[in-house]
Amino acid sequence: MNDFKERNVEFQRAVPDVYGDAHPKGLLKSIQEDGEHLKQLSSQHIISSDQFGRDVLLQLFRLAAKFEANPQRFRTPLQGKILISAFYEPSTRTRLSFESAWHRLGGDIMSITDRSTTGIAKGESLSDVGEMFNNYGDCVVLRDTNESSVKDMMRSLRIPIINAGN
């Protein structure tokens, strides 16, 4: 007989209070909804949080709280959308946070974690790779050691790119 069954061992995850005073429903009440601020984000490249003003950031936090407060309602806004996750620098937490969020919102992911498996290894420029990404995905998240990588790729992208760090 299985040793665990003999001892009646049950494994349960404790549910920690990760919110403290910042529970999503409290956040929803404290920030007035103003969707006008989010309209400017449609199909926009995200290079740095510095590019957003306070009002846009507050509306993003409010939207995130809406998703978290009612995850069943927001299960598929990215259905049919493909994220190209190009992490040319090791970063497990950052990569998985982007991929998990995209997946939880109903999207699909194409993940590249090794520069040597791309055309870059054969001498293609990031601009060339960006042109290829236009044909396969709806959004790119890029992390690279080179600070100019995002701007190099932006030259040829017709889809949004998110800078995941460099």
Predicted features and spans:
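Positively charged, low-complexity intrinsically disordered leader regions
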Residues: 4-96
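Phosphate/diphosphate ligand-binding glycine-rich loop within oxidoreductases
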Residues: 76-166
